C-alpha cells in the first residue's frame, strides 16, 4: 500500500498540476486582497473572513473534485483502473487512490487557509495597506478580542488565542474537504456517466443548500459550516452535524465501491 501511495503521489507532479496547486493555495489570499479595499475594517478577523468566504462557496465541491478526482475519472474512463486493480489488488488500488485524494485535498485546503491567516493577522496589520480601504475604523486594542470572539462560528475559540481559532477552523475545513473529496471519488467510481460522477457532489451540495434554507434550517447547511459568515455565530456542535452527514455518505459510497470491486470494469 505504501509504495502504491508513493507511486500515485509521484504521478501528480507536472507543470500544469503545479500551477493549479499554487493557484489553489493563493486563491483565498488573492480574493481577500481584491475585496478588502471595498469593505469596512475593524479587526484582522474581518480580512480573514473575506479571504475564506465569497463566491467559491457556490462551487466548492467542484473545486475539490478538480484537485484529484477529475484526473482519476479520466483514468477510470480509459480502463486504467481495471488494469491497475488486477496488477496491484483491489484493496491496494482503492486504498491508494483514497489516501492520495484525501492527502492532496487536505494539504491544499489547510495550506491555503493558513497562508490567508498569516496574511490577514500578521502581514496586513503591520503594513499600510489597510489604511487605504473603505471604512477603515480599527477598534481599540482592548476591544479587538471581544469583537473577534463574537463575529462568526469558530471565532469563539479565539478566547484561547487567535492561533487556536485559526488552527481549529482551518483543520475543520480541511477535514470536511477531504470527506467531500472522498465522496466525490466514490460517486465517480459508481456512476456510469463520468460527468454525472464528477458533478454528483456539487448537485447534492446545491440541493441540500436550497432544501435546508427552505426548511428554515440554514444553520445545518454544508455551506454554512464551511463558510460561516452568512449566519450569526453558532455553538461548535452545529457545524459538526453536516460534517457527520457527509462522513456517513462517504463511508456508504466507499463500502458500495468495495462490494462492487469485482465488477469495476463495468463501472464509469
What feature does the model see in each segment?
Residues 1-22:
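Aromatic- and glycine-rich beta-strand/loop motifs that create alpha-glucan
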Residues 29-71, 75, 99-181, 185, ...:
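Secretory targeting signals
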Residues 24-32, 206, 240-256:
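Hydrophobic core of alpha-helical transmembrane segments in multi-pass integral membrane proteins
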Residues 22-39, 209-213:
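Alpha-helical transmembrane segments of multi-pass membrane proteins
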Residues 70-104, 264-266:
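Helix-loop-helix units of permease transmembrane domains in multi-pass membrane transporters
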Residues 186, 190, 244-268:
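Junction motif at the cytosolic side of a transmembrane helix
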Residues 16-17, 89-91, 193-198:
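Membrane-helix interface segments
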Residues 22-26, 194-208, 268:
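Central hydrophobic cores of alpha-helical transmembrane segments
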Amino acid at each position: 500500500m505504501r509504495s502504491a501511495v508513493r507511486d500515485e503521489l509521484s504521478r501528480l507532479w507536472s507543470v500544469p498540476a503545479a500551477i493549479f496547486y499554487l493557484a489553489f493555495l493563493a486563491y483565498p489570499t488573492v480574493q481577500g486582497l481584491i475585496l478588502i479595499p471595498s469593505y469596512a475594517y475593524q479587526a484582522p478577523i474581518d480580512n480573514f473572513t473575506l479571504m475564506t468566504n465569497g463566491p467559491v462557496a457556490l462551487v466548492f465541491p467542484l473545486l475539490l473534485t478538480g484537485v484529484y478526482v477529475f484526473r482519476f475519472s479520466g483514468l477510470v474512463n480509459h480502463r486504467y483502473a481495471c488494469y491497475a486493480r488486477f496488477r496491484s489488488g483491489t484493496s491496494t488500488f482503492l486504498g491508494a487512490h483514497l489516501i492520495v485524494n484525501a492527502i492532496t485535498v487536505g494539504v491544499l485546503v489547510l495550506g491555503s487557509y493558513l497562508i490567508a491567516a498569516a496574511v490577514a493577522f500578521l502581514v496586513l496589520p503591520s503594513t499600510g495597506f489597510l489604511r487605504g480601504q473603505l471604512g477603515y475604523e480599527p477598534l481599540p486594542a482592548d476591544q479587538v478580542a471581544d469583537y473577534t470572539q463574537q463575529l462568526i462560528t469558530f471565532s469563539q475559540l479565539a478566547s484561547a488565542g487567535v492561533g487556536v481559532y485559526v488552527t481549529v477552523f482551518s483543520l475543520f475545513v480541511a477535514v470536511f474537504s477531504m470527506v467531500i473529496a472522498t465522496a466525490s471519488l466514490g460517486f465517480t467510481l459508481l456512476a456510469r456517466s463520468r460527468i454525472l460522477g464528477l458533478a454528483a457532489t456539487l448537485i447534492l451540495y446545491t440541493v441540500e443548500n436550497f432544501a435546508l434554507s427552505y426548511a428554515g434550517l440554514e444553520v445545518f447547511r454544508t455551506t454554512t459550516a464551511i463558510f460561516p459568515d452568512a449566519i450569526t455565530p453558532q455553538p461548535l456542535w452545529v457545524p459538526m452535524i453536516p460534517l457527520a452527514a457527509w462522513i456517513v455518505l462517504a463511508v456508504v459510497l466507499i463500502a458500495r465501491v468495495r462490494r462492487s470491486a469485482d465488477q469495476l470494469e463495468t463501472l464509469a
